[in-house]
Design a protein with these regions (language model features):
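Membrane-embedded alpha-helical bundles of multi-pass enzymes
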Residues: 1-140
Length: 140
């Protein structure tokens, strides 16, 4: 698979992920959104799988936390540029979770549906987060 195709699949996953959370009501998308990025990460070295997972996570969290820039600017007194940089920093940090998730799931010899069911909640439990934006919050 070409690199451009893999990037497109990771971006697609990142766009679909936030649609499964409150406000949209498309809760199955939080599981379905992982399919394109898992296809992109298939048969890759762990560091490459991590990159695609990280891209997916960055976009997904930005979709969910775009409001942070306004909060940083309005209540934190930051300039708009610093507010957006702060938002990207938070989304990058949180995107690490998806980087690790996709790396682990792509490297396990189990079918992705089984490994996702165990690895995703385990990582969410272990990974310190700022806001409760875990998969359980989407399953309403």
């Amino acid at each position: 698979m070409k690199t451009r195709t893999r990037i497109t699949l990771a971006v697609l996953s990142g766009i679909l992920e936030p649609l499964g959370f409150a406000g949209f009501g498309l809760f199955p998308l939080t599981w379905i959104a992982k399919v394109p990025v898992l296809l992109a990460a298939r048969d890759l070295a762990p560091r490459l799988a991590f990159r695609y997972g990280m891209l997916y996570g960055l976009i997904a969290y930005f979709g969910g936390y775009h409001w942070l820039a306004h909060t940083f600017s309005t209540f934190g007194g930051l300039s708009p540029v610093l507010a957006w940089l702060g938002t990207m920093l938070v989304c990058s940090y949180l995107g690490l979770l998806f980087g690790f998730l996709i790396t682990l799931v792509s490297q396990l010899k189990l079918p992705p549906v089984w490994s996702l069911a165990f690895v995703n909640p385990a990582l969410e439990l272990l990974f310190p987060n700022i806001f409760p934006y875990n998969i359980g919050a989407s399953q309403h």
